């Protein structure tokens, strides 16, 4: 079993993610364990597939192997674009302007993305609308707030939990705090992680991996 462990430290809090070798684990399973895993994943697949179908019907562009809550799907519109192998646990995404999410992105629960503000220098106090682009291999964990002044989170960016993001995040930067500031650079991205498996949404990937057994 190959395990990769990395830490993010911000505000004196440490986080650890343990990633098991997905392909090796599935290929070495007994037939009984494989079928059991398939049954569990089928139940989750039905739920997540329904959400994706609803989001697409509402005009959103959704890639393959995407896990998202039903509540987000019901609020989706043509401003939402999501790539492949994405896990989203929040429904607090402001879709009054385009939000583009790349491939292999992880967004945790209670994270909020805001794309609209007000013109504080105007007597009418009218709305000001912005969009957000989240590039590939970005990790946004729990309870992050992304304000309209942030327009892009670049490739491999990581934001620590509870942070308030007020400006763009550079590629491979690890940021945290309020306001979020960079405190280190990420050494690699999670290329070996099957992102959709984090919430049990890997029904198709699970089957394909098993079938490729040599």
Regions found by a protein language model. Give the residues of each.
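Residues at secondary-structure transition points
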Residues: 77, 96, 125-129
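Left-handed beta-helix
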Residues: 64, 69-70, 83-84, 88-90, ...
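C-terminal segments of enzyme domains that contribute to small-molecule binding surfaces
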Residues: 26, 126-146, 178-214
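Ala/Thr-enriched low-complexity intrinsically disordered regions
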Residues: 10-13
């Amino acid at each position: 079993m190959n395990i990769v462990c990395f830490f993010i430290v911000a505000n004196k809090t440490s986080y650890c993610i343990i990633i098991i070798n997905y392909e090796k684990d599935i290929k070495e399973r007994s037939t009984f364990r494989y079928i059991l895993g398939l049954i569990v994943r089928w139940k989750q697949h039905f739920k997540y597939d329904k959400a994706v179908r609803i989001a697409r019907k509402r005009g959103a562009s959704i890639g393959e192997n995407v896990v998202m809550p039903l509540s987000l799907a019901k609020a989706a519109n043509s401003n939402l674009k999501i790539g492949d192998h994405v896990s989203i646990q929040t429904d607090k995404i402001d879709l009054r302007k385009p939000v583009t999410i790349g491939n292999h992105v992880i967004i945790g629960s209670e994270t909020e993305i805001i794309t609209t503000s007000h013109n504080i220098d105007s007597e009418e106090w009218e709305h000001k609308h912005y969009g957000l682009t989240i590039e590939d291999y970005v990790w946004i964990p729990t309870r992050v707030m992304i304000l309209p002044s942030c327009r892009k989170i670049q490739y491999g960016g990581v934001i620590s939990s509870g942070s308030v993001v007020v400006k763009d995040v550079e590629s491979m930067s690890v940021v945290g705090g309020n306001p979020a500031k960079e405190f280190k650079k990420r050494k690699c991205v999670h290329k070996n992680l099957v992102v959709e498996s984090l919430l049990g949404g890997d029904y198709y990937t699970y089957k394909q991996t098993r079938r490729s057994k040599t």
